[in-house]
Structure formats: structure tokens, C-alpha cells
Curated annotation (Swiss-Prot):
Function: Catalyzes the oxidation of 3-carboxy-2-hydroxy-4-methylpentanoate (3-isopropylmalate) to 3-carboxy-4-methyl-2-oxopentanoate. The product decarboxylates to 4-methyl-2 oxopentanoate.
InterPro entries on file: IsoCit/isopropylmalate_DH_CS, IsoPropMal-DH-like_dom, Isopropylmalate_DH
PROSITE patterns membership: IDH_IMDH
Pathway(s) it belongs to: Amino-acid biosynthesis; L-leucine biosynthesis; L-leucine from 3-methyl-2-oxobutanoate: step 3/4
Record: residues binding substrate: 97, 107, 136, 224
Cofactor, free-text remark: Binds 1 Mg(2+) or Mn(2+) ion per subunit.
Gene3D superfamilies listed in its UniProt record: Isopropylmalate Dehydrogenase
EC number: 1.1.1.85
Cofactor(s) named in the record: Mg(2+); Mn(2+)
Protein name according to UniProt: 3-isopropylmalate dehydrogenase
Amino acid sequence: MKEYKVAVIPGDGIGVEIVGEALKVLEKVGAKYDTKFNFTEVKAGGCAIDEFGVPLPNETLEICKNSDAVLLGAVGGPKWDTLPGEKRPEKALMGLRGGLGLYANLRPAKVYDILKSASPLKEEIINKGVDLLVVRELTGGIYFGERGRDIQNGINSAYDTERYNVEEIKRIAHVAFKAALKRNKKVTSVDKANILESSRLWRETVTEVAKEYPEVELNYLYVDNAAMQLVREPSQFDVIVTSNIFGDILTDEASMVTGSIGMLPSASLRNDTFGMYEPIHGSAPDIAGQDLANPLAQILSVAMMLEYSFNMTEAARDVEDAVEKVLNSGYRTGDIYTEGSKKVGTKEMGKLVLAEL
């Protein structure tokens, strides 16, 4: 029997409820595939501020470092919005990414046939199908570059610096090409190489890496055009690879193409099999503790964990198929409910997925 250690961070708001359902799924998968998952629950975010005075306690980071993967719910909420920036719950995410060396963020955006009506796009666009993956560089670029304020010609000024080196670009490009090999073998590299020097280096480096993957088609888009194409014809995309700031914007846009943010998981990875997995939605404190939250993004995050950290691809497909079967049977949480479907709560949705596994 294989054994894996999973650090569990329920976090704030609905995190506790949806993580609870996801862990049941992981346990059932373990029983089916003769694998034991050992869970250690730790705190980060607002609940950690309340208890320890910091968003990311050292103990949490150490336990995560000594695990095979991390399952994260959601952090934050209006309760902590008045705190200074460094003390806010969201700082826990930056601390986890940096402390665990996670440099690649993978966000799939898929429109399920049965949920097409949720998309804000026209039917003729969405009917072509949307199943793309955005691979975003997570630890470089303008968010981590030199910044500051000064006085220029007697006027208050501020600056931020976009900087990348070849190695940072190479490693994220490899992640994208390897992902494409398992998908439809197409990578779109998004940059602003007509203006930015950092983007020119990005394009040169991605072009070099592409030579190692002759079976994968590579094309390029400037970021402004990519943003337009995502809503004009999202079906053209398979894997999109891009820098930190461009990825931050495009992943949010891609999530709204689906119209169902409660369905979308994400993974943050590094060079080995370790990863941190979480839904892309927030902590939704307004519906916390009321059995209203959609647990499917969290459950699909477990599917990504099975695939990327534990190399259990068949098990990952089982989870994805179970989710799709439940949706096809007409069950919906409130966020994706439409007239004629059957409305269920967090716990019931979790039970329905378990029954299909």
C-alpha cells in the first residue's frame, strides 16, 4: 500500500465545508486504489491571524514542507480587511508559494456541456467547446521585481520592475509543453514582445524550449490580442503559457468564460511532484456555515492532486467523471442552479460525487 502525507489548510469562510467534502473523496479514492492518505490539518489565513497573530505560522509552513501535497480551501474575508497589507490573510498565499518554491500555477477552464448556459458568451461561440489550461509563472516578473517611490522633478513617483531570467522562463515553458503532451499538443505563448524587452527574452526562450517538443505546436499572441481571443474564440486554445502579471489577468478572464467560478480548480507546482491545490474562488463568508457552498472546485482540485503529485491519472479521471455524472443527472448547488435542475447543498453534492466513484 502506498502512503502519502497531505497537509490540509481549510482556511476561512466556506473553506472548512468544501475541504471536508474533498477529503471524503480522497479517502474513497485511496480505498479503491490501495493508497493511504494521511491528513494533517493546519491553519493559515484569517483563522491563523485570530489564533496566532500572523497569517502563516511557521508550524504551518514546516508541516507543508514535510508533506507530499497541500490541499487549501480559501483564505480571507472582510473581517480582516482593515489590517495592514503585510498582516492580511492573503499574505499566507504568497508565503506558501515562496516558502514551498511553487513557481507554476495551472488553471484549467472547462465548460461542461450541461453548464453551457452559465457562460456569458454567445451560444455559437460556446458550442465549439472550451477546455483550456493556463500555465502562469508564479514567482518572477513585476510582482517580485524592484519597486519603490521617489521624487522625479519635484513630483511624487512610483515604479515597479518587470524582470525575468532565462532559467525562470525555461522551467515554466517545460511545464506548459509537458502539459500539452497530455492534452491536444498545442501551446500558445502570451507576451508583449512588440514593446517589452522582458517579453522578447520570454519569446526567444520559449522558442528554444519548443525544439525539445517537436510534436507540440507552438504559436504566439500579444497579451492584448490574447485577451480578445479568449472571448472571441476560446475553443482555439489548448495550453496558454504566460508571465505572472499577464497570467493573473488572463486566468480571471478565462474563469468567466465558463461562467461557473465554483467549478474551477488550480494547482501550484515546482520541479518535483509536490504541489498545492485549491479552488480559484474566494472564501465567500456571506454563505459560510449554511451548507450552500459549491464543493466541486475543491473536489476537482483533488483530481489535480491525484494527477500531478501522486501520478494517479486513472484515479483523477474517476473523480472528474464522477463530477460530470452528477452534473448530467441534474444536480446543482445554488451558484450554478437553473430552472428545472435539482438544487442541493454542500454536503449532499459531496455525497452524490462519492456515490459515483
